[in-house]
Amino acid sequence: MFKKLTLVSAITAALAGCGADDQAYDYVERDAKEVAVKDLKDGRWFYVPTTGAAPRFALNQFPFLQGSPRYVELCFTKEGLEVRSYDKNYPDAHLSKDANNYCGEEKFVADDDGVNFAQVLTIPGDFAAYRCQEDAHGDCTNKEETNEDASLNYKKKTHFTPRPEDLEIAEFNMEDLYGITEGIDEIGAPRLISWDFDPKNGLLNFELERTFRIDLDNISDYINFATKASLDEALVDGAFKSRFYYSLVHESEVATEGYQPILYPVGDENDIGFFTTSTKKLNPVTNKYDRDVVYLNRFNPDQGSIKYYLSDNFFEEKNKLFLDATLQSIDKMNQALNVFGADAGKPEIEIVNKTKAAGIHPGDLRYNVINLIDEPLANGLLGYGPSGFYP
């Protein structure tokens, strides 16, 4: 009896060893850009669009022109990832969304608080849910499949693959006001140049390349004929490519917790000259925007140093003169700041990459960048220092 029992046990063990549970789980091949919807970091984010590389001959293209910063909230809709500007007059209000970061739905006419969050943009994409493929007996085969059940509510889908090249921008920004698309037509579809999607750690960055052609009616406004020997030579500049960088970064990655804002009277601004941020506040009694508030723009004075990166082209051999001059200038500035003493609230400027390129894009909100434009531009762009500010 015992021998027979042992034999049966051995056969059972052998069969168990050949089952699906011991096989490696075979996952569906995923797009590299795919993210889990639950991983979208909760809270508010900063958003800034920036024009990237542009041809030097394009009169209406301003390379590395920073758009206006936006303080936003994010949630998923059926169309994709929606970016909405927060309601500054009610800073404690938040977009309604469920545990998986899908936007809430207003069930009643009176429940309309969500419309107070201005539309900024939508990143379209595809949603998916996955499950284990089952055999005829309903057992898992250790092979994953996409859940194609038509009755599955989109809010039950667990993953999102963005299509940033189909970006839908709703807001007006500085790029629109400065004529980035005025007098030109876009040709074809944008091309995704680079991307860094890590929503769990508060990062959604990407860069698009777009192709434009000057409208025939505006050709004299957007081609500098004075620099051309003939009409044929001038017409070559009638079409071009430009790049646009979009940076979405969670506030925890860039804002200093506990920072105290400084009110900055207009009289002081006229005498001293710091950059400022102005806004109008809603009076809760009169329901009118009758309060002007001006804040001083500054770095957090309590940090040890203000870190800057140099753009990659500083380290090209032809630009060594600019590199040396920049480093020497920063040293002189720090010497002047040190005169005020260590307790003066004036951190020194630190160049992080003094000897080699760091691959940091000037449009990435996580970094301060000194960007070298090392060739003459037909639009006459001069040096300027745009900054993003906490609202």
Language model segments and positions:
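Auxiliary tRNA-acceptor-end handling modules of aminoacyl-tRNA synthetases
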Residues: 20-321, 327, 336-337, 354-391
